[in-house]
């Protein structure tokens, strides 16, 4: 989500600098939104056949690849709206797909306090979104560069969160054996 907020904060500047009108900029959000929805519904379907713990590492890999791809497009090419939207839409698809798994995993240990756990999860998520937007806003004089740097930096944060959660699950599994 922090990546979305980073992009939403800077995209009017980025796309405006590329010569796009406000209408074009507004319409450009349709594709990532559709990708997010497709990812979410596809995940629900996939979870009927594949366990979330099997699917999530692949989704994280795709997320990291999309962030690297977006960074490369932005820094090593003359980016266009289409070349920026391709990795961004992949990121949106993967975010939509991973969201149900991540939220379920976050709430699972707190079945008796799910309301409080959901509030904490939302607070952490929105806090990271705020931080991403804040960093982009602080360096908005170079909107594309700071945006893709913040978005790329979200990949190790996501991996760290996964590794912490995974280590806890493995440790609990060893204790109960």
Question: Where are the model-predicted features located?
Answer:
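Transmembrane alpha-helical cores of Major Facilitator Superfamily
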Residues: 30, 34, 89, 119-127
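A late C-terminal transmembrane helix in Major Facilitator Superfamily
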Residues: 103-141, 150-151
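Residue-level signature of mid-helix packing/kink "hotspots" within the transmembrane helices
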Residues: 33-41, 130
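Recurrent gating helices in multi-pass secondary carriers
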Residues: 1-9, 96, 126, 130
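Extracytoplasmic gate region of multi-pass secondary transporters
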Residues: 1-30, 36-37
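Multi-pass alpha-helical transporter architecture, strongest
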Residues: 149-177
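C-terminal transmembrane helical hairpin of 12-TM major facilitator-type secondary transporters
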Residues: 54-101
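Helix-to-loop junctions at the C-terminal end of transmembrane segments
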Residues: 39-53, 140
